[in-house]
Amino acid sequence: MVSTPFQPLATLDHLVVAATTLADGIDYIAEITGVAPQPGGKHVAMGTHNALVRLAEQVFLEIIAIDPAGVKPARARWFDLDNIALQAELTERPRLIHWVARTTDIERAVAHCPIPLGNVYSMARGHFRWRITIPDDGAPPGKGVVPTLIQWDVPLHPADTLPKSNMSIAGLAAAHPDPGVIRAALAALGLEGVLPTTYDRDARLAAMLHTPRGIVTL
């Protein structure tokens, strides 16, 4: 009997950096990396807007902030952006708060993950259409260490529209008070090799980037 190679349910799609304002986030990334983020657009359903940097084929860095011209949604915004404590931290500097993994079968991936990822919602920005997991309270799963899942429903990926940036991922790392649970969730999605996770009392996520200004850690 011929065995079928394991097909991961998900792969890295993008990193999420939050900022108090989008301008602050753009300036911060440009200053520490030497790479200018490109304009993204508005997420009307969430009252947020973003800017992007290409990191690799179909992989990008997203800078996101609450859109002051947008309408506050009736539900909690994604990525915990309504969290007062997070917003207080963002006044110090923009921060890497989460990551998003891409799948071609989001319902199956959600069912396969031992950590609840939230409900699946349909979203749009410009020509892009996608489905994404969002917990009811907006807080990222696993304190930000377990990824949100996304399934793009159009052929064009956001990174395909961005210029090459001379910036790429050197590595990712995470810590969590219960790393075994996190490792099990990542393994269920086929992501165990993407994000090495160790023990710490406080959950945290780090991304090391090759940039024109050397290795930069977010």
Roles of regions detected by a PLM:
Residues 36-43:
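Conserved catalytic-core motifs of GNAT/GCN5-like acyltransferases
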Residues 2-12, 17-36, 54-218:
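Glyoxalase I/VOC metalloenzyme domain signal
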